[in-house]
Design a protein with these regions (language model features):
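Catalytic Walker B motif of ABC-type/P-loop ATPase nucleotide-binding domains
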Residues: 167-170, 443-446
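Conserved ABC ATPase "signature" region
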Residues: 120-138, 397-409, 431-432
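ABC ATPase NBD Q-loop/coupling interface
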Residues: 68-83, 359-375, 379
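H-loop/switch region of ABC-family ATPase nucleotide-binding domains
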Residues: 203-204, 478-479
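Conserved ABC ATPase signature
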Residues: 142-146, 150, 413-417, 421
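ABC ATPase nucleotide-binding domains
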Residues: 235-302, 515-553
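ABC ATPase C-loop
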Residues: 159-160, 431, 436-437
Length: 553
């Protein structure tokens, strides 16, 4: 019998000075050629498990480990990351902290050089991995000119260039647009199916990858809560933790339909078998309570929080200066909640940085009369202390920490928090105005849902709605269409530096091929959230009457 790629026996781990273990008596086997999806709430231990599988736990982080952990036949307690590096590749939540070379080519060549590969072997490996990840055009770019999504693909390429037996990915689609995210999952599936590479990825956006997985392991408080097939996971999540359910499965559950689907294709097939025809392009009557603007005073309606007029921004990308933003005309008023969307490199982050006066336009103007606070893609950029409580001191700071669920973390180092926890701390800092010297008229956030589970996203949406209700405009650059559908009162879509769509979420997120929610893709329009989709399906079920054997509950 072949030895598993990874074998954990009663494996536990506690970080230095932590009161509770991060991993508790894990009993797991990861087989050769499996594609495993790690699910679970933020801070549940998913990232720690990945770090253990590549040897960073305990060799880099320290702390106490017990039990047995073997990866590719090596005892991880005796063999660290250097010895596992050629066998196990790792892509972290924040790729900007993983990329160390000044150019993309140098980043990909570095692991090959360290292994002593010849120039010919390096050239071939670079050609293959850059083609696979569609980054050939980036090879000679300085890494500090890349967008977050481009950095994500470069970090993955560097992890794959040695062709490891096992690849570990922590939130790999978190900074990728829907197109690039689908391409990445397709690539991982191809590597898994055609080359037998083991894949373990931790994700919160399960709708992107559940259909590609062979197996789902859900982790909660450092222990395995579920281990089984994607189909069984959907049924388990619906009963045990609906926050983990992907949107399509959640819609089916709310409508009383079974079985719960693991993909858009499976959902459409089930609806056809049940004889439920949903008319594509039906007007979307839903507008979630959270998405309704409440701050509507006459004077405030006429005022402006953020305004761009014929905005042009240039950037040196390493291959010459190019226009990153062109002819942008945009007015955002107090109380609006705007989702700024578009492909990687479309100009979303540049627009937010221009609003915060971090870069200057070459033509036109962008104004924020009452100032603009910015949460950057890397939340760690805002941390200046070694203690969470010192980032937001005093009673007001403690209230801000409590609002993001971090009141118990006041004594921890911000850099030791999980990715989702760091994001929440940064949001508290920005919303409190600490990053801009006071309360601003516009609060801008760049990919704030990275590392967050469904429950935390809903909490974030509620907090941002409260900020907007108090009179500040909230602008969120995001690839998370599901979050945008429930949070935003308006969606602005950028394409290659230009504004190409601007309207209600129901208009923008239902009609497109890629910037559409899972519910919209299943139904062909008519609804964009699980709640709205379930209402539409229940209406169709009632129209069909007693001839349809569906239990409405």
């Amino acid at each position: 019998m072949a030895e598993p790629l990874a074998n954990l026996r009663a494996f536990s781990y506690r970080y230095p000075d932590a009161a509770e273990p991060a991993l508790r008596s894990l009993e797991l086997e990861l087989g050769e050629g499996e594609l495993v999806l790690l699910a679970g709430p933020s801070g549940s231990g998913k990232s720690t498990l990945l770090r253990a599988l590549c040897g960073l736990v305990p060799h880099y982080h320290g702390g106490e480990a017990s039990g047995e952990l073997r990866v590719c036949g090596l005892d991880v307690r005796e063999h660290g990351p250097a010895e596992l590096g050629g066998l196990v590749g790792m892509v972290f939540q924040e790729p900007e902290t993983q990329v160390v070379s000044t150019t993309v080519r140098g980043e990909l060549e570095l692991p090959l050089e360290l292994r002593g590969e010849s120039a010919a072997a390096r050239a071939r490996a670079l050609e293959e991995v850059s083609l696979a990840l569609a980054i050939s055009h980036l090879l000679d770019r300085p890494t500090d000119t890349l967008s977050g999504g481009e950095l994500q693909r470069v970090a993955l390429a560097a992890a794959l260039v040695l062709r490891p037996r096992l690849i570990l990915l922590d939130e790999p689609t978190s900074q990728l647009d829907p197109v690039a995210g689908d391409e990445l999952i397709g690539l991982l599936r191809r590597l898994n199916e055609e080359w037998g590479m083991g894949v373990v990825l931790a994700e919160h956006r399960l709708e992107r990858c559940l259909g590609a997985a062979d197996r789902v392991i859900s982790v909660d408080e450092g222990a395995v809560a579920f281990d089984g097939s994607p189909q069984d996971f959907c049924a388990w999540a619906d009963e045990s933790d609906p926050q983990l359910s992907p949107p399509g499965a959640r819609m089916f559950a709310l409508a009383g339909l079974r079985p719960l689907p693991v993909s858009v294709k499976a959902a459409r097939s089930s609806l056809r078998e049940l004889g439920i025809a949903v008319r594509a392009g039906e007007p979307d009557s839903e507008e979630p309570e959270q998405a309704r603007p409440r701050w509507r005073g006459r004077r405030e309606r006429q005022s402006i929080a953020l305004s761009a007029r014929d905005l042009w921004v240039e950037r040196d990308t390493g291959g010459g200066v190019r226009d990153v933003l062109r002819r942008v005309e945009l007015t955002i008023r107090p109380g609006e909640r705007v989702a700024l969307m578009g492909r990687n490199g479309a100009g979303k982050s540049t627009l937010l940085r221009a609003a915060a006066r971090l870069i200057e336009p070459v033509r036109g103007s962008i104004e924020a009369p009452d100032g603009c606070s910015l949460l950057p893609q890397s939340p760690s950029d805002l941390f200046v202390h070694e203690r969470v409580g010192d980032e937001l001191p005093g009673d007001e700071g403690l209230r801000a920490l409590a609002s993001v669920g971090l009141e118990q973390a006041v004594e921890r180092d911000p850099r030791d928090l999980s990715g989702g926890e760091r994001e929440r701390l940064a949001i508290a800092i920005v919303s409190a105005g600490r990053s801009s010297g006071g309360r601003s008229g516009a609060v801008c956030l760049d990919e704030p849902t990275r590392g967050m589970d469904g429950a935390r996203k809903r909490e974030l949406g509620g907090r941002l709605a409260a900020i907007a209700a108090a009179g500040q405009a909230v602008v969120v650059a995001t690839h998370d269409v599901e979050f945008a559908a429930g949070f935003a009162t308006r969606v602005v879509l950028l394409g290659d530096g230009e504004l190409i769509a601007d309207g209600r979420p129901a208009e923008i997120l239902a009609g497109g091929w890629y910037f559409a929610t899972e519910v919209a893709r299943i139904l062909g329009g008519g609804a964009i959230t699980p709640e709205g989709g379930a209402e539409l399906l229940r209406s169709r079920i009632r129209e069909l009457g007693a001839g349809l054997e569906v239990e409405l509950r």
